[in-house]
């Protein structure tokens, strides 16, 4: 069989496995992935690792998950790199190691994996497992936000609000919080409500302030929104 035929066959089986997985037929998917994974197919290895990590179609086994994910990651599979990073971050199947987590997140982020970009941005902002780097945190957050990652949108609002490596810019802060808020990010809703209450970056608007603060409270950010809500309600 030619290399092209083998490649086409592998891709066809991968597509069949993914369809089965999405339909909830996890065992069928694993039966299709396993032979490919044992033959060294990186995406199949990554998917096997994810299955063992989540305990879908097989008993959850972080050790086996790490074994498959490492094989995929070392071949350059971005999903494998991201999930291996998660294992190091959480200490699943390996000793917890923030530096190793950051290293693998960065490899995946450099391949345009938006979830890795989002997580790496957060780690760079806090200096967790890597040197604190506000410029890199902003850069990775911008990339992840472009893919719709709402946490990065909210983080960019915080970066501009708190002048973390940039000039303080209330307008940009409110703009990023708005983008995250309409997508349901409770903390961004609270901060946007506070911005409307104070007239920082947006025109002062108590109705809008109450709207977003109440949504934040309902969405689980009640502690953050509470003080602003009291102020907004006292003024109406």
Regions found by a protein language model. Name each.
Residues 13-14, 19, 36, 47-54, ...:
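Hydrophobic face of amphipathic alpha-helices that form TPR/SEL1-like repeat modules
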Residues 1-12, 35:
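TPR-adjacent "capping" and linker segments in tetratricopeptide-repeat scaffold/adaptor proteins
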């Amino acid at each position: 069989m030619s290399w092209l035929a083998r490649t086409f066959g592998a891709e066809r089986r991968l597509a069949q496995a993914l369809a089965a997985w999405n339909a909830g037929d996890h065992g069928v998917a694993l039966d299709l992935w396993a032979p490919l994974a044992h033959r060294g197919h990186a995406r199949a290895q990554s998917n096997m690792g994810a299955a063992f990590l989540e305990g879908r179609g097989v008993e959850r086994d972080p050790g086996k998950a790490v074994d498959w994910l490492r094989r995929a990651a070392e071949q350059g599979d971005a999903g494998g790199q991201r999930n291996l990073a998660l294992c190091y971050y959480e200490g699943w199947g390996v000793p917890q190691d923030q530096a190793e987590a950051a290293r693998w997140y960065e490899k995946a982020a450099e391949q345009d994996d938006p979830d890795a970009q989002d997580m790496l941005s957060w780690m760079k902002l806090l200096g967790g497992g890597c040197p604190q780097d506000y410029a890199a945190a902003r850069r990775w957050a911008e990339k992840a936000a472009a893919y719709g990652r709402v946490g990065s949108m909210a983080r960019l609002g915080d970066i501009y609000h708190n002048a973390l490596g940039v000039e303080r810019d209330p307008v940009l802060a409110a703009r990023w919080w708005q983008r995250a808020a309409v997508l349901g990010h409770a903390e961004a809703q609270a901060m946007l409500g506070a911005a409307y209450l104070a007239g920082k970056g947006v025109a002062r608007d108590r109705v809008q302030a109450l709207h977003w603060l109440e949504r934040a409270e309902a969405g689980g950010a009640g502690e953050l929104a509470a003080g602003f809500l009291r102020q907004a309600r006292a003024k109406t």
